[in-house]
Amino acid sequence: MSKEDSFEMEGTVADTLPNTMFRVELENGHVVTAHISGKMRKNYIRILTGDKVRVELTPYDLSKGRITYRAR
């Protein structure tokens, strides 16, 4: 799957789950489970409940995603 197949949406972290997983509420009201991307994990980017994040979703499974950016 190439990067062009995925799309990004903005959301807010609603809950922190084990193993660096997060429950994110998207702007359209949907709730997805998301994990941190590799570059964010490598650079020790901390994500807390209430943070605004950008989530990358695939058209194959819209209930899971990858957090690619945390707004300041």
UniProtKB/Swiss-Prot annotation:
GO molecular function: ribosome binding; rRNA binding; translation initiation factor activity
Primary location class: cytoplasm
Subcellular localization(s) per the UniProt record: Cytoplasm
Keywords: Cytoplasm, Initiation factor, Protein biosynthesis, RNA-binding, rRNA-binding
Pfam family, one: eIF-1a
Transmembrane segments: none
CC annotations in GO: cytosol
Superkingdom, taxonomy of origin: Bacteria
Classification via InterPro entries: NA-bd_OB-fold, RNA-binding_domain_S1_IF1, S1_domain, TIF_IF1
UniProt-listed NCBIfam families: infA
Quaternary data: Component of the 30S ribosomal translation pre-initiation complex which assembles on the 30S ribosome in the order IF-2 and IF-3, IF-1 and N-formylmethionyl-tRNA(fMet); mRNA recruitment can occur at any time during PIC assembly.
Family affiliation: Belongs to the IF-1 family.
Protein name as it appears in the record: Translation initiation factor IF-1
The gene coding this protein: infA
